[in-house]
Curated annotation (Swiss-Prot):
Belongs to the cyclin family. PHO80 subfamily. InterPro entries: Cyclin_PHO80-like. GO terms for biological process: glycogen metabolic process; negative regulation of glycogen biosynthetic process; regulation of glycogen biosynthetic process. This is PHO85 cyclin-10. Keywords: Carbohydrate metabolism, Cyclin, Cytoplasm, Glycogen metabolism. CDD domains: CYCLIN_ScPCL7-like (cd20558). Forms a cyclin-CDK complex with PHO85. Interacts with GSY2, independent of the presence of PHO85. It comes from Saccharomyces cerevisiae (strain ATCC 204508 / S288c). Its main location: cytoplasm. Residues 1-10 have a biased composition (Basic and acidic residues).
Amino acid sequence: MDMTKNHTTDTEEFDDGDIRPVSLGIVDDYNASFELPLKPKFLQSENFSDLTSEWDQSRSNTPGLAEGKTEKAQPCGTTDSSKNRIHVEQLLESANEMNNYLAQNIENINNFQVGLLNGGKGLYSSMGDDSSACINGTNFSSTSNFELSDDELEDTTGCTSSIFDKDLFHQQNGLSIPRRRSPLFKSPTASFEIGDATDVEEQDIDDSIFSECSSITSFDMGGLHISLPHDEEEDQEKTKSESENPLLHGIPVDVEVPHISVDEALANFKETIELLLKLSGNRKCTGFNTRVEKKEYSNFYMKSKPTLSSADFLKRIQDKCEYQPTVYLVATFLIDTLFLTRDGNNILQLKLNLQEKEVHRMIIAAVRLSTKLLEDFVHSHEYFSKVCGISKRLLTKLEVSLLICVCNTKLMVSNRKLAASKLLLNELRSFCV
């Protein structure tokens, strides 16, 4: 039987070189066919031209690559840098625009630089409600827009207070830092190294040194009289000395501080300031106390009244710092201590007249000092100065000035003082009716 009759192969040729279908037919029991995408032998080299082409050193290193299409190897990163490269004409045009801008605004730029060197003189910033950052749960925003007086900006190296520390110019940038020790209480401390010997006598320490140190009960520094606690007897004397404060008359020692919200504490603080302003405007209620340091108290005076009201200013401080109610209670008592006293008939009387141009700086100093008396963690010097819209140097000056003004009173916070702020407000209300 001839096998060529059973297996037949049909081929068709195409002039365009397309794939020629090859059909294999098996005609025994049925007719079945399938197609394979193959090319004839004379076109097979085009299936894998890169592999079948001969090597030619005169051509490209890549076999099968047409002449004129050779690619040169480029170092890594040259393609991206060439795409981002600025044209020379565009660069010259940008430089020309920058020179024109500097020529038109060179005077403003010089004034701005001089203002920075003078500690911020003449610089203004908008007090916006939008915050640009939120770190440690505290909003960070721009400063306020009221102008600082010229007195604290003329001298860039010193301060009106003799206890000003130059190290306060170098504050850290953190918004929440551990509580720092005040420079008011910075005193040189003796330091010595203990050797390997365990016997104390080998250190040659004279007991008289300790006896002299233990005999020191108080000292004066920068106009402040600072007493050092030693034992329980002195603690009892402190509680007795609180009764010497005329504002605490009639308040029991074991008084309980009533629960109060932040809004109520802020409202009491605002109302206390408003009543003090009202009393200061009354000719019958004139300040008579001359023991307050006039030089330090003058730091609270501003040349012009701020455009922001004291109520909005307090709201801004609370929004950015989120203080507890006790902070405003202590701040209220500090304001009362500075401006109020009692006469021989146990009636409230003004020691100083409060003016509108002193309110904002008085608020700054009272709130800042209150936080340091109560809290272990306070906002950084830089952050609080930006919240209040003043320089760091002025913030230090206001804080120290308030300390010196109330140096004759005990600063230790007690329940009596927390409760006194509310009771004194009630007396002021009845007194101003």
